[in-house]
């Protein structure tokens, strides 16, 4: 099977890369093993929240300039501030075209409210998520009886520290009792599958209406809206106060929805989606990827003109930690890591951890190296890249988006030259 590009990994980076390549008229396939990290995320995307020295970033342009001085090997630093902003804006356009109408500005970060009621700087958020400063003074944080993925009293306690009048309440929906037989089934995603049925909408409205008459804003867990935000908009039109949603513990409704919207758009545009499959071997001859072998296709290789590695970091097994060191398991690419295992981590858990910055070694075009030699038609994107800390620097989603589009543009340019 021949393709212009085969992408190994179906997370945020892989999907955005595929969508951008389709814009250039290239035929793409994505091989994905299972759920991506988006299923376990808040559904919001960070661009750059803090510098390596811990200084918070609000002006993105100034932050990118400072980042280049502090971390010259960061993926953003390799591209330059203006290029990062341009690619980020293009990524936002792609997301919106896929149905993910996310709120945000590449030039200026905003503060979203977290499930614990604290604030986190971010780039893009779903319109349901409350953004600071809140537009209300009288707030009620509403939990769902029996739902352990969200603790209303914890969020309320944090918000009260910001001089807000915050109460808590709990709604009990007997229609959800079918899920209560097994506590592991009473999760936000399973609740959403029931509540997203249009016949159940009035039940949720009836439960929230008495609370809405006594406050200016309801904050509740995101336990509906797996496919879209239609129910949220329907409730907002009818309730006498604003309704906002907070992400829950994973799996996350908002994260799953974002992934599904991108995946459906990729397939609609003619992309080949290979779920439940796994790349077992890549044939690389003279610095060129020629064949990709997967578990499900056995002796039938995929033959791409270009290949993209979007396999993620440790969480997605894109990187594997062993006693002897860190390795990239598919091709055995060169990995940037510390000299000894003792340097992988810091003693204090909440300090920036060195292992977060481990990843494959690439050139400025994000082409990785194998035994010191660049693989000419292979690109590495997203969390598998080295040189950045997605947690401490708050840049995980941004690096995925920016590197994906940079690789896609580079591939499209080279593909045009080869025709």
Curated annotation (Swiss-Prot):
It catalyses: a quinone + sn-glycerol 3-phosphate = dihydroxyacetone phosphate + a quinol. One of its GO terms (cellular component) is glycerol-3-phosphate dehydrogenase (FAD) complex. Its EC number is 1.1.5.3. GO terms for molecular function: glycerol-3-phosphate dehydrogenase (quinone) activity. Gene3D superfamilies: FAD/NAD(P)-binding domain. Keywords: Flavoprotein, FMN, Oxidoreductase. Conversion of glycerol 3-phosphate to dihydroxyacetone. Uses fumarate or nitrate as electron acceptor. This is Anaerobic glycerol-3-phosphate dehydrogenase subunit B. The lineage of its organism: Bacteria, Pseudomonadati, Pseudomonadota, Gammaproteobacteria, Enterobacterales.
């Amino acid at each position: 099977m021949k393709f212009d590009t085969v992408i190994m990994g179906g997370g945020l980076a892989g999907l955005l890369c595929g969508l951008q390549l389709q814009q250039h008229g290239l035929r793409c396939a994505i091989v994905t093993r299972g759920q991506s990290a988006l299923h376990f995320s808040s559904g919001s995307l960070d661009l750059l929240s803090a510098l390596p020295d811990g200084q918070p970033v609000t002006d993105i342009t100034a932050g990118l300039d400072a980042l280049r001085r502090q971390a010259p090997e960061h993926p953003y630093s390799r591209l330059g501030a203006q290029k990062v902003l341009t690619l980020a804006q293009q990524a936002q356009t792609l997301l919106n075209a896929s149905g993910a109408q996310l709120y945000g500005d590449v030039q200026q970060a905003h503060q979203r409210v977290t499930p614990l009621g604290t604030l986190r700087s971010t780039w893009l958020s779903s319109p349901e998520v409350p953004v600071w400063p809140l537009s209300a003074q009288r707030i009620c944080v509403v939990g769902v009886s029996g739902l352990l993925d969200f603790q209303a009293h914890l969020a309320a306690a944090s918000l009260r520290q910001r001089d807000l009048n915050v109460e808590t309440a709990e709604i009990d929906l007997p229609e959800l009792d079918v899920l209560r037989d097994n506590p592991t089934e009473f999760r936000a995603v399973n609740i959403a599958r029931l509540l997203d049925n249009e016949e159940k909408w009035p039940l949720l409205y009836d439960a929230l209406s008495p609370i809405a008459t006594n406050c200016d804003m309801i904050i509740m867990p995101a336990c509906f809206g797996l496919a879209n935000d239609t129910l949220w908009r329907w409730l907002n039109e009818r309730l006498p106060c604003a309704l906002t949603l907070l992400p829950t513990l994973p799996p996350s409704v908002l994260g799953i929805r974002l992934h599904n919207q991108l995946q459906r758009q990729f397939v609609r545009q003619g992309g080949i989606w290979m779920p439940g499959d796994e790349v077992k071997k890549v044939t690389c001859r003279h610095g060129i990827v020629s064949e990709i072998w997967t578990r499900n296709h056995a002796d039938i290789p995929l033959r791409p003109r270009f290949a993209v590695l979007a396999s993620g970091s440790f969480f997605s097994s894109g990187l594997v930690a062993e006693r002897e060191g860190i390795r990239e398991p598919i091709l055995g690419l060169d990995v940037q890591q510390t000299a000894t295992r003792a340097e992988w981590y810091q003693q204090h858990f909440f300090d920036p951890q060195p292992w977060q910055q481990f990843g494959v070694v690439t050139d400025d075009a994000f082409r990785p190296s194998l035994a010191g030699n660049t693989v000419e038609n292979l690109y590495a994107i997203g969390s598998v890249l080295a040189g950045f800390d997605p947690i401490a620097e708050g840049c995980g989603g941004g690096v995925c988006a920016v590197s994906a589009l940079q690789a896609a543009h580079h591939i499209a340019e080279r593909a045009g030259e080869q025709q």
